[in-house]
Amino acid sequence: MTLLNVSDLSHHYAHGGFSGKHQHQAVLNNVSLALKSGETVALLGRSGCGKSTLARLLVGLESPSQGNISWRGEPLAKLNRAQRKAFRRDIQMVFQDSISAVNPRKTVREILREPMRHLLSLKKAEQLARASEMLKAVDLDDSVLDKRPPQLSGGQLQRVCLARALAVEPKLLILDEAVSNLDLVLQAGVIRLLKKLQQQFGTACLFITHDLRLVERFCQRVMVMDNGQIVETQVVGDKLTFSSDAGRVLQNAVLPAFPVRRRTTEKV
């Protein structure tokens, strides 16, 4: 089943020039894509190529300048109030900048309960039980429930944001560089959790990343973005190779996971 369909999407931002006239900076140009239930897809590209802007459009935080976005066959622009609430529950996003994604005055307990209060019909006790369950799933415990964001490390806060998104059991989870910043052990744990969710609920995942290792370990398909356009799409197999210049540049930039000791024949 197709969850999300994007056709001919373009987007620009207006900014003032020296003449006082508004100039338009194109960020996305004729982007088309589709995501199916249970699918894991990567959107791969360098910083500044338009990946995060596309993500904001997909979750409805901004409206595109041109083109269409449909959720389960319904255009986002035509969703009624009830449908929009269901859409906000079904599609969740975890941002790269976790500090800006939470209220620093709220406790972790309040942060986790917030989407459940607004999007689910759960009693308070059920919300608290699910909050504990989600924390455990991302390798945190109840000791952080009464802490506030400034009291957490960056990795802990990122996992809190992931737990918050998972608490409403979304149909599609968009992760904007949200896993790449975790260390390899935590990253592996999160990936195991996401695989489990896919098996249980058919959750689809869209990884927005520049981390090719993450793509090769977890994704079934990868789209390469460059200068606001998707320049190629590849199925991820045993040997992932790219035909576009942008894809090859990213592939050549990958460093080994561990340092390689060079042998030397020089005598001291």
UniProtKB/Swiss-Prot annotation:
<keyword id="KW-0406">Ion transport</keyword>
<feature type="domain" description="ABC transporter">
    <location>
        <begin position="4"/>
        <end position="252"/>
    </location>
</feature>
<keyword id="KW-0533">Nickel</keyword>
<feature type="binding site">
    <location>
        <begin position="45"/>
        <end position="52"/>
    </location>
    <ligand>
        <name>ATP</name>
    </ligand>
</feature>
<dbReference type="GO" id="GO:0015413">
    <property type="term" value="F:ABC-type nickel transporter activity"/>
</dbReference>
<dbReference type="InterPro" id="IPR017871">
    <property type="entry name" value="ABC_transporter-like_CS"/>
</dbReference>
<comment type="function">
    <text>Part of the ABC transporter complex NikABCDE involved in nickel import. Responsible for energy coupling to the transport system.</text>
</comment>
<dbReference type="InterPro" id="IPR003593">
    <property type="entry name" value="AAA+_ATPase"/>
</dbReference>
<protein>
    <recommendedName>
        <fullName>Nickel import ATP-binding protein NikE</fullName>
        <ecNumber>7.2.2.11</ecNumber>
    </recommendedName>
</protein>
<comment type="similarity">
    <text>Belongs to the ABC transporter superfamily. Nickel importer (TC 3.A.1.5.3) family.</text>
</comment>
<keyword id="KW-0921">Nickel transport</keyword>
<dbReference type="GO" id="GO:0016151">
    <property type="term" value="F:nickel cation binding"/>
</dbReference>
<keyword id="KW-1278">Translocase</keyword>
<keyword id="KW-1003">Cell membrane</keyword>
<keyword id="KW-0997">Cell inner membrane</keyword>
<keyword id="KW-0547">Nucleotide-binding</keyword>
<dbReference type="GO" id="GO:0016887">
    <property type="term" value="F:ATP hydrolysis activity"/>
</dbReference>
<dbReference type="InterPro" id="IPR003439">
    <property type="entry name" value="ABC_transporter-like_ATP-bd"/>
</dbReference>
<dbReference type="InterPro" id="IPR027417">
    <property type="entry name" value="P-loop_NTPase"/>
</dbReference>
<keyword id="KW-0472">Membrane</keyword>
<comment type="subunit">
    <text>The complex is composed of two ATP-binding proteins (NikD and NikE), two transmembrane proteins (NikB and NikC) and a solute-binding protein (NikA).</text>
</comment>
<keyword id="KW-0813">Transport</keyword>
<dbReference type="InterPro" id="IPR050319">
    <property type="entry name" value="ABC_transp_ATP-bind"/>
</dbReference>
<keyword id="KW-0067">ATP-binding</keyword>
<dbReference type="InterPro" id="IPR014137">
    <property type="entry name" value="Nickel_NikE"/>
</dbReference>
<dbReference type="Pfam" id="PF00005">
    <property type="entry name" value="ABC_tran"/>
</dbReference>
<dbReference type="GO" id="GO:0005886">
    <property type="term" value="C:plasma membrane"/>
</dbReference>
<dbReference type="GO" id="GO:0005524">
    <property type="term" value="F:ATP binding"/>
</dbReference>
